[in-house]
UniProtKB/Swiss-Prot annotation:
Pfam families from the UniProt entry: Cellulase
Full protein name: Mannan endo-1,4-beta-mannosidase 3
Keyword Aminoacyl-tRNA synthetase: no
Domain of life, per lineage: Eukaryota
Principal location class: secreted
Active site: 203 (proton donor), 323 (nucleophile)
Binding-site list for substrate: 87, 202, 283, 365
Originating species: Arabidopsis thaliana
Gene Ontology annotations for the cellular component aspect, listed alphabetically: apoplast
Sugar attachment sites: 17, 75, 133, 153, 343, 386
Length: 414
């Protein structure tokens, strides 16, 4: 306990001086770019595992809890985790980033500034998501409600994708984000190489049009807009990876039945020219609750392998597994089962990367810091606990880093 208190105290001191450290100790790494199915950083292929920490800006809004961000990032680098995925939104509600359309809470924005500055100082790349599909933290529902309050004829959350005013709200948020000047680093977000890329939305879905055409049209419009205001950063969709009408065989053999009404199409959504890399998530426990553990593990491997095959041969773009995990509330759960999921996931990613394939890394859901009980859930992991799962994370991330060190470019023809 004394050791932990010392670490937390040290983290607080670092956090209090971060406005200087974030600038003076900034990593010299450049922007992550793409060449064929690989990411490139400083002229070499870039492979890296990472984690989700959606709570960064929320906790960093209060300067007295910013040490949690520092502590998590320090622990992440110890375990060779060098990408973090986080929310670039909190629409309405407590500690909102966007209080109303185009109206932002400066204190909350400074929380996101701090998280980016700390990631920069400690050499961690960031993937930042613009909005949520779900009503958690506002999301599509909040945007539609804002439009409804102005007298717009909207009745469904899916109007988010078609209503002109709602679409303009989204574009305004994107523009505000990319033009934000970080109060710690003094660098505009669009010029910040610490940001690896943006995601259009967290797990976009459109039940109003199961064909996928509405969502694809929205993604095309918004992806082109993002690129028009920020040409330096990579962009992806934030999709779960469910197949649509463009891949009928994959749709039948891989999708959970419930996913076939969500209006997403892994191939069509990612073939868009302005989308730089593919995004998938993996939760076989949630998607196939009636299957036994062995069957779910086999489906996990097949899910990853098929998406990697399509990223290589059809999309010709890199792929990041943006979310995965093993919930502790799965009936019959054991630590060994969680370890098996992490091993299978990381092994599949590594096998692709070692061959110069499209797998760039896996980001598990999700990391919390010691004592963060308000964010604890069946999927949360505390790195400092050094569980068997954490040991697997460390070993596999170091292996992936060694591929990066070899600097071999793919010979794949594009």
């Amino acid at each position: 306990m004394k050791c932990l208190c010392f670490v937390v105290l040290l983290a607080i001191l670092i956090a209090q001086n971060s406005s200087d450290l974030g600038v003076k100790s900034a990593s010299s790494d450049g922007f992550v770019s793409r060449k064929g199915v690989q990411f490139i950083l400083n002229g070499k292929p870039f492979y890296a595992n990472g984690f989700n920490a959606y709570w960064l800006a929320y906790e960093a809004t209060d300067s007295t809890t910013r040490f949690k961000i520092t502590y998590v990032f320090q622990n992440a680098t110890i375990h060779d985790l060098t990408i973090v995925r986080t929310w670039g939104f909190r629409d309405g509600g407590y500690r909102a980033l966007q209080i109303a359309p185009g109206v932002y809470d400066e204190k909350t924005f400074q929380g996101l500034d701090f998280a980016i500055a700390e990631a920069k100082r400690l050499g961690i790349k960031m993937i930042i998501t613009f909005v949520n599909n779900y009503s958690d933290f506002g999301g599509r529902k909040q945007y539609v409600d804002w439009a409804k309050n102005t007298g717009q004829n909207v009745s469904s959350d899916d109007d988010f994708y078609t209503n002109p005013l709602v679409k303009q709200y989204y574009k305004n948020h994107v523009k505000t984000m990319v033009n934000r000047v970080n109060t710690f680093t003094k660098v505009e977000y669009k010029d910040e190489p610490t940001i690896m890329g943006w995601e259009l939305m967290n797990e976009p879905q459109c039940r109003a049009d199961p064909s996928g055409k509405t969502l694809t049209a929205w993604m095309n419009e918004m992806a082109l807009y993002v690129k028009s205001v920020d040409s330096k950063h990579l962009l992806s969709t934030g999709l779960e990876g469910f197949y649509g009408d463009s891949s009928p065989q994959r749709k039948t053999s891989l999708n959970p039945v419930a996913a076939n009404v969500l209006g997403t199409d892994f191939i069509a959504n990612h073939k868009l020219d302005a989308i730089d890399f593919a995004s998938i998530h993996s939760y076989p426990d949630l998607w196939f609750p009636n299957l036994d553990e062995k069957s779910r593990l086999n489906l996990l491997r097949k899910w990853l392998e098929c998406h990697l095959e399509d990223a290589q041969n059809i999309l010709k773009k890199p792929l990041i597994l943006g979310e995965f995990g093993k919930p502790t509330n799965t009936p019959g759960y054991t630590q060994a089962q969680r370890d098996a999921v992490f091993n299978a996931t990381f092994d599949t990613i590594y096998e692709s990367a070692e061959k110069g394939g499209p797998a760039a890394g896996a980001l598990f859901w999700h990391v919390i810091s010691d004592g963060m009980n308000n964010f604890k859930d069946p999927l949360s992991i505390v790195l400092s606990e050094n569980s068997t799962t954490v040991n697997i994370i460390t070993e596999e991330s170091r292996k992936l880093g060694l591929i990066r060190g070899k600097g071999k470019l793919s010979k794949t023809k594009i």
